[in-house]
């Protein structure tokens, strides 16, 4: 048995769940009476969504449907970074929604500082887009998990725990 235990804190989402969510949103938009004739398009790209629709009102309705469907499929709403809508030709509105994935250096440093200040028995190492927390006892790691969960709202990114060993 190893003398130390560790886990990784990451910020990720299930891409297939996002694809399924967007399929449900498209189906919902096609069936809703107020959105049926809006000619709404939702495109998924590698790091963002692009929503193109008829007006600001229909854009807001599509955003609400997207949030509701994502919540039902257990996707955190923190993965969506809604940019400001912009006008495109022919009275249409386009909005880019960035998808947050991975921990930025700034957030990783903030997270590591929080854990280091509160818990002295664990060590924190930033590894690219994740943070590894190592400790001698599993109880210390459980305390670290509880601490990170309690501070998740301050960090404004969805956090998951992986590789608990």
Swiss-Prot record:
GO cellular component: cytosol
Keyword Manganese: no
SUPFAM superfamilies: YajQ-like
Annotated signal peptide: none
Highest taxon in the source lineage: Bacteria
Intrachain S-S bonds: none
Alphabetical UniProt keywords: Nucleotide-binding
A matching Pfam family: DUF520
An example Gene Ontology molecular-function term: nucleotide binding
UniProt KW Acetylation keyword: no
Main function: Nucleotide-binding protein.
NCBIfam families xref list: PRK05412.1 (NF003819)
HAMAP family reported in the protein's UniProt record: YajQ (MF_00632)
Annotated family: Belongs to the YajQ family.
This protein's name: Nucleotide-binding protein SYNW1816
Lineage: Bacteria, Bacillati, Cyanobacteriota, Cyanophyceae, Synechococcales
